[in-house]
């Protein structure tokens, strides 16, 4: 059976952003089916809209199903995994610039603050997420302006993720940080799927 990878963009993201097209092409060249769905209303993301959108894109999840999340896409993937029926396991996930604990440096605009509170204030059962996720990797940058490094704690301690800290990659964004290739993400997907 073909291994499938679903890439979830972040807040204000889109499928052609940054390193997503490169990663899609790299993994397809190695025999994976890769999907990068446009999550609805990316400028004002909502859990109750994004999670069902991921579920619809995935269909039936199994051990041949892998995920890559970027920023808020990591939360969306984890919250999707939380909804899976008991006993269902996926192959693994690579989280890039993910967070459960806190964000930093956000604008004071009310809509930005409200979106931040929506995602960080809505409880998530990471033990349930872990029950569906046997293997994961969480990648951070030492100079991310929005995702402080203490976010790694939940990934390591509650999800059992391997932690990787990259140097000077910012938020791993295409526009702001000019990241159009991310070999560490490709390599970790290949390792998880190995």
Describe each PLM feature range.
Residues 10, 39-42, 93-103:
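Active-site nucleophile loop of the alpha/beta-hydrolase fold
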Residues 67-77:
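Gly/Ala-rich beta-loop-alpha elbow adjacent to hydrolase catalytic centers
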Residues 145-151:
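Conserved alpha/beta-hydrolase "acid-adjacent" motif
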Residues 177-194:
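Catalytic active-site module of serine/aspartate enzymes centered on a nucleophile-bearing elbow/loop
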Residues 31-35, 157-174:
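Catalytic histidine neighborhood in serine/cysteine hydrolases
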Residues 132-133, 137-140, 144:
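Short beta-strand/loop motif that positions the catalytic acidic residue
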Residues 2-63:
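Active-site catalytic motif of lipid deacylating hydrolases and related acyltransferases
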Residues 45, 169-182:
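Catalytic histidine-centered segment of alpha/beta-hydrolase-like enzymes
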